[in-house]
A protein has these predicted regions:
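Short, flexible helix/strand-to-coil boundary loops that buttress conserved ligand/catalytic motifs
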Residues: 77, 93, 143
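Short, hinge-like loop/turn segments at secondary-structure boundaries
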Residues: 82, 100, 146-150
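Short loop/helix-cap segments at secondary-structure boundaries that form the rim of catalytic
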Residues: 73-79, 139
């Protein structure tokens, strides 16, 4: 009988096939899981972590890049972010960014892949890059201040995305 597991039989313990889908494919062996999750953290940054780094005294060690259109930027953006629309990365990144400083990209939110496309373009140009999970949507929903063409704004934290009255989720 052929196994449907993505792992060779010798790398995971005997695991009965459950009736529900959660464990129908067994969890990865710990070393493989650690490598996978470490790699995920090499590609992504959390909104709360970015906010904490930007709020701390001194240089956060990265540049935050808003990859949306000018209209979107004016509607609202993270304070201190650099504006470089995805379509202009190849043409303007060299003039706006320092290759020795990591870049964290963001776009509208989880339903938009503009930050992913900008991150790809930057990586292809030789920049170290991560993507901010949740984008501008989650920045606003977590209650962080943002700038608009009319000035600064801030909304209360959405209790479905961030603890109300706390600086971070404690993750």
């Amino acid at each position: 009988m052929t196994s449907l597991s993505p792992f060779p039989a010798a790398t995971h313990p005997v695991f009965p096939v459950p009736a529900h889908p959660v464990l129908r494919v067994p969890p990865a062996p710990p070393a493989e899981a650690a490598a996978h999750f470490r790699a995920m953290l090499a590609f992504h940054a959390d909104v709360s972590d970015v906010a904490a780094a930007l709020a701390a005294d001194g240089d956060p060690g990265f540049v935050l890049l808003d990859s949306r259109s000018t209209e979107a930027w004016e509607q609202g953006h993270v304070p201190g972010a650099v504006h470089l629309p995805t379509a202009l990365v190849a043409e303007q990144a060299e003039q706006l960014l320092d290759r020795s400083v990591p870049v964290v990209t963001y776009c509208w939110g989880p339903g938009c892949n503009g930050a992913t496309r900008a991150a790809l373009a930057l990586a292809e140009l030789g920049f170290q890059v991560k993507e901010m999970l949740g984008g501008f949507e989650y920045w606003v929903r977590e209650g962080f201040a943002y700038d608009t063409w009319q000035g600064p704004e801030q909304r209360p934290a959405d209790p479905l995305t961030a603890p109300v009255g706390a600086d971070d989720c404690g993750c």
